[in-house]
């Protein structure tokens, strides 16, 4: 699996203490039954190392790019990532 760093966002003002999150796009090559790429996301809290990743969300690169942009803009943390992505998928 490959990864692409999308953004690092400072959330200190919202949290009231030093806090920043890094947002990555995860890329997995799929060869069967057709050759394509599957995309997911990972969010990491830089101060603690807490992280959550959700692979295989979509095969559409534009969709995962839009998703990770919304995650970064919204300051989504690892503990809320699954819920936010589930709502995004609906």
State where each predicted segment sits.
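Negatively charged, low-complexity tracts enriched in Asp/Glu with abundant Ser/Thr
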Residues: 1-23
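Residue-level signal for well-ordered alpha-helical segments
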Residues: 2, 18, 41-44, 48, ...
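A generic structural signal for solvent-exposed, polar alpha-helical segments
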Residues: 10-12, 29, 45
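Compositionally biased, low-complexity repeat tracts
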Residues: 12, 36, 70-71
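Amphipathic, interaction-prone secondary-structure segments
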Residues: 15-39
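A short, structured beta-strand/loop element
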Residues: 31-53
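Mixed-charge, Lys/Arg-enriched low-complexity segments
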Residues: 50-90
């Amino acid at each position: 699996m490959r990864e692409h760093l999308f953004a690092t966002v400072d959330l200190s003002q919202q949290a009231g203490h030093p806090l920043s999150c890094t947002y990555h796009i995860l890329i997995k090559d799929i060869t069967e039954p057709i050759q394509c790429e599957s995309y997911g996301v990972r969010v990491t809290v830089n101060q603690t190392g807490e992280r959550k990743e959700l692979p295989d969300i979509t095969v559409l690169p534009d969709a995962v790019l839009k998703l990770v942009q919304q995650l970064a803009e919204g300051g989504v943390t690892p503990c809320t990532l699954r819920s936010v992505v589930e709502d995004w998928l609906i």
